[in-house]
Amino acid sequence: MSADVSTTPAAENVNGAAEASPAPAAAAPSATTPEVTAVENSTPAPAANQPHSASLYVGELDPSVTEAMLYELFSSIGQVASIRVCRDAVTRRSLGYAYVNYNNTADGERALEDLNYTLIKGKPCRIMWSQRDPALRKTGQGNVFIKNLDSAIDNKALHDTFAAFGNILSCKVAQDEFGNSKGYGFVHYETAEAANNAIKHVNGMLLNDKKVFVGHHISKKDRQSKFEEMKANFTNVYIKNLDSEIDDDEFRKMFEKFGEITSATLSRDQEGKSRGFGFVNFSTHESAQAAVEEMNDKEIRSQKLYVGRAQKKHEREEELRKQYEAARLEKASKYQGVNLYVKNLTDDIDDEKLRELFGPYGTITSAKVMRDTNVERDQSPDSAGKEKEADKENDKEATPEAEKAEKAEEKPSESSEEKDKEAKKSDKKPFGKSKGFGFVCFSSPDEASKAVTEMNQRMVNGKPLYVALAQRKDVRRSQLEASIQARNTIRQQQAAAAAGMPQPYMQPAVFYGPGQQGFIPGGQRGMAFPPQPGMVMGIPGGRPGQYPGPFPGQQGGRGMGPNQQIPPNFAQGIPMGMQGPGGIPNGMGYPQMAQVQFGRGAGGRGQVPGMPMGQGMRGGPGYGQGRGAPVQQGQMRPGQGGRGQNAAAPAGPQEGAAGGVNAQTLGAAPPAQQKQMLGEALYPKIQAQQPELAGKITGMLLEMDNTELLSLTRKPCAPRSMRPLAFTMST
């Protein structure tokens, strides 16, 4: 039976030798349709006298091969129209194959003849005509399977051997992950007659002193159905747990009563001793089935035998893999939602203390603190001194007087059983330094959820615990890759924004502290998509590039309505060059955060109450009244904002002081404003301790729950205790 090789888009893009392609593309089915600019033939099968397209498939490429490397090689043949290395749609890693398109077919024929099996980055490439029609690729006509190949035979040697029987479309020797030959390969001829001719002349011949088998390739589907039929009609029986004293004659007589035996053998080692298992092959399936049913689990010479159908190695490995996968899934579903991960533990917390901490929240099935098992227990000075004394005693001469003195000094203090118990207790004690994390498993998801709610961020021995549901390593890795990819995307968008390039999508809103770089909190509720850093969010109902309703600089406005609002620190943190008249960012919206209203005025020229006067603002410093009379920095005249200014509004900026944030005001505020209020309360405290990282650390802390943030605002030194954690996260 022919062996199987994983199929890939590379194989499907060439011809019927689907099983003769590399395996990397199986992880990225989304990248299976490369862009090939050349025109393809639509004939049922390529013939020798028909012109090919100018598109070539290049396989067996190293993952580091790029389009530039291929262009340097293939441009020596003729003018190259395009080159594309096919990559995974998600990771953008090379799938190991590419397409090279020439402007004319003659150059493609020369490249196929001259460059096939050329070394690229130390690996011989495999070149063939591209065939995009899947029906033509999967016909299998002319596909030949060769097995029992010598390990020295590579793709080129196999091609040279079988090229005498006809035009070869594809030729490949299967290799493992280390590049070693698996002992079989495939040759796809252009016609079925050439394939039959190769089978007739090469099958049973010697290649490098090894007799090879050459036959028509059987598809995986047909092989699978044939394999199932063979399993249902097995004749070969495997027996294990045999006594080592059983010889070949006795072994054969044990199974002769079930039917005619064609062969029976015991496996022996190099010394000729039985290895405890053997094989019996019957002439009929019924005899083999009867032997399995009667002899399985039967005791012979005090050993229970195992008798079953003989399996090949790959079949046993596949069965074990399925059993392991089923056990893993069962275990994962069993502990789904009940297993907790606890980190930031102090060194003095062991398994018992961890169980005591989480015991009040439910029934704990297991609790374990992970420790470094490679660290051996250090010997105490007392034990070291006792060992030295024992060594000195052992150095004494064993005289009769000394033996009598030792017997006289012996006391019936402890029995050997008590000593054994103490030794067992000492062995059970955990050794090695704590890794600072552990796991707690509850009996129900409700108990685990309650423990997460109550114990997360709780201070234990001066350190806040981190408690969350335990996740598998592959899940954590995928989440980490997703977060890294999102972070890289944000950096790319920021770089593009700095260069003035258009953005494909907008980024989360940024909280700006006074004179600080902004940080990026989570997305706000109600936002269709978050705005760019350095920008502020638009109000629902506004058109892109404009503020909702009339505003200075827009047409058709007589001032803002009474329900239109603007934040108190609106102008702070906006980069230079992005402000329009009045300090407003050009073409950008603003969030509804501060409850400050405009008064109705002509032309909408009113000063925004509670908004700091920016340089160059209408009515602000540097912008004079009437003919531009100068106003000193920090001064403000009554009525300076124009006719639309609200007389009852305060002239200075309004700030949310830390003392003004309490649970009542926080609960009354909308969710989008709560984080802003807490950030404004925490920012001054953190800025006093970390001026350079104040904005970033504040952003990190705002990822915590609002109740915890509220408690931090009430404690003057609370941010100091959180500083190491936030500082670590920020770096």
From Swiss-Prot:
Cell membrane keyword on record: no
PROSITE patterns in alphabetical order: PABC, RRM
Annotated region described as Disordered, given as residue ranges: 1-51, 369-429, 603-665
Any single biological process term in GO: regulation of translation
Compositional bias of kind Gly residues: 616-627
SMART domains tied to this protein: PolyA, RRM
GO cellular component, one term: cytoplasm
Domain annotation PABC: ranges: 658-731
Family, similarity comment: Belongs to the polyadenylate-binding protein type-1 family.
Name of the molecule in the record: Polyadenylate-binding protein, cytoplasmic and nuclear
Lineage: Eukaryota, Fungi, Dikarya, Ascomycota, Pezizomycotina
Gene this protein is translated from: pab1
